[in-house]
């Protein structure tokens, strides 16, 4: 991550479906020089001006999450607005499996290594994608003024921690099944998907718990 994005986003609507309990909208968020961010916005019929926005970042992809009604039924009942997105390299933009040899222990080895070699680690690029989603929340008429809570699992965890440290528009973060300190990589170097969240030299300056401590919001 080298600097914060300075180009404005462009919001492109790509679909709309009316369901019994909610309205579903599809968007592509475009920012010059960056990958498009595909996302799905779900507005429950019970939503109101005080409804929080839950930004869901699922390593398995937003489509897989939405394929199980039980995953979001409670949110609909409680009137919570759901924003689901696939950050670059996952979900809609997952690299074909044949490009990654299993011996490297990383589901996105090609993308992760190329990103490091060009000086833009994939984790930092995903932080930019999260900032793009926050810009969307600030600009779209359905989302302006609503608090934003981020739920991130797996590979997305460290990117969510960095975004929460950098952007006060995030009210809180909940992380599951993810790394919360890079020291784990040193203590147990044989882990899956380490390259996805490596920032070379970062431990000379900070670790993920430092960002959690310095963020003036709940991150757990």
Language-model features: where?
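Generic recognition of stable, solvent-exposed alpha-helical segments in well-folded globular domains
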Residues: 24, 52, 67, 125-132, ...
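Short, solvent-exposed amphipathic alpha-helical segments in soluble enzyme
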Residues: 43-45, 70-74, 165-169
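Generic alpha-helical hydrophobic packing signal
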Residues: 24, 41-44, 81-83, 160-166
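Cap/lid segment of the alpha/beta-hydrolase catalytic domain
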Residues: 48-140, 145, 180-193
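Generic beta-strand/beta-sheet core signal
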Residues: 30-32, 40-44, 56-58, 85, ...
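Leucine-rich solenoid repeat scaffolds
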Residues: 215-220
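Primarily recognizes the serine-hydrolase "nucleophile elbow" in alpha/beta-hydrolase
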Residues: 133-206, 210-214
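Non-catalytic accessory segments flanking enzyme active sites
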Residues: 1-43, 112
């Amino acid at each position: 991550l080298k600097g914060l994005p300075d180009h404005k986003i462009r919001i492109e609507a790509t679909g709309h479906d009316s369901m019994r309990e909610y309205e579903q909208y599809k968007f592509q968020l475009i920012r010059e020089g960056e990958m498009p961010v595909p996302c799905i916005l779900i507005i429950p019929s019970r939503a109101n001006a005080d409804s929080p926005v839950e930004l869901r970042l699922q390593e398995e992809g937003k489509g897989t999450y939405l394929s199980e009604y039980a995953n979001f039924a409670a949110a609909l009942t409680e009137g919570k607005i759901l924003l689901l997105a696939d950050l670059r390299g996952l979900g809609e933009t997952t690299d074909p499996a044949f490009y990654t040899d299993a011996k490297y222990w990383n589901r996105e080895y090609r993308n992760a290594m190329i990103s490091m070699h060009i000086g833009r680690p994939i984790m930092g690029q995903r932080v930019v994608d999260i900032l793009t989603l926050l810009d969307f929340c600030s600009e779209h008429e359905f989302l302006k003024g609503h608090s934003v809570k981020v739920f991130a699992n797996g590979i997305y965890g460290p990117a969510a921690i960095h975004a929460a440290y950098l952007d006060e528009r995030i009210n809180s973060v909940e992380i599951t099944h993810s790394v919360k300190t890079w020291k784990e990589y040193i203590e147990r170097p044989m882990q899956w998907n380490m390259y996805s969240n490596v920032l070379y030299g970062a431990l000379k300056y900070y670790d993920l718990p430092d960002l959690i401590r310095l963020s003036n919001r709940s991150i757990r």
